[in-house]
Swiss-Prot record:
Name the record gives this protein: Aspartate carbamoyltransferase regulatory chain
Molecular function terms from GO: metal ion binding
GO biological process: 'de novo' pyrimidine nucleobase biosynthetic process; pyrimidine nucleotide biosynthetic process
Role description: Involved in allosteric regulation of aspartate carbamoyltransferase.
Residues given in the record as Zn(2+) binding sites: 109, 114, 138, 141
Entry annotated with the keyword Zinc: yes
Length: 152
């Protein structure tokens, strides 16, 4: 007699699944993107096994559907993530993420002297993609930052 001791994250009937999030980043995504500001059920998995990443995080939100624009904002924190739209337990749309050219209200400016810290404005960065990194230029102080300096 064999016993299967694996627990699986329950499938959702309708909603959004954000998969292939780097381990330890899922909670940050939940918080920064205010994904918990819903009455719908949210299922999360942290440090799940992953062939590509070693470990990954996973977020499932029932009856909430991210647009491509919303999904692409996640690419700053989880560039290899995929966003799957689910209907009747089936993936009806699978989105690979791509950083937008303009990133607004996603990350704060690392320059402590930037006016975005003291004025009622949302952060805004122009995004330049290079083969090995991403450089963000703040709309207000015009300073350039590499991705790792911004996402902390």
């Amino acid at each position: 007699m064999t016993h299967d001791h694996k627990l699986k994250v329950e499938a959702i009937k309708r909603g959004t699944v954000i998969d292939h999030i780097p381990a330890q980043v899922g909670f940050k995504i939940l918080s920064l993107f205010r994904l918990t500001e819903t009455d719908e059920r949210i299922t999360v998995g942290f440090n799940l096994p992953s062939e590509n990443l070693g470990k990954k995080d996973l977020i499932k939100i029932e009856n909430v559907f991210l647009t491509a624009e919303q999904a692409n904002r996640l690419a700053m924190y989880a560039p290899q993530a995929t966003v799957n739209i689910i209907d009747d337990y089936q993936v009806v749309n699978k989105m690979a993420l791509s950083l937008p050219e303009l990133l607004e209200d996603v990350v704060p400016c690392p320059n402590s002297n930037c006016i975005s810290h003291n004025e009622p404005v949302q952060s805004s960065f122009r995004v330049k993609k290079f083969a090995s990194d991403v450089v963000l230029t703040c709309k207000y102080c015009e300073k350039e930052f590499e991705r790792h300096a911004v996402i902390r």
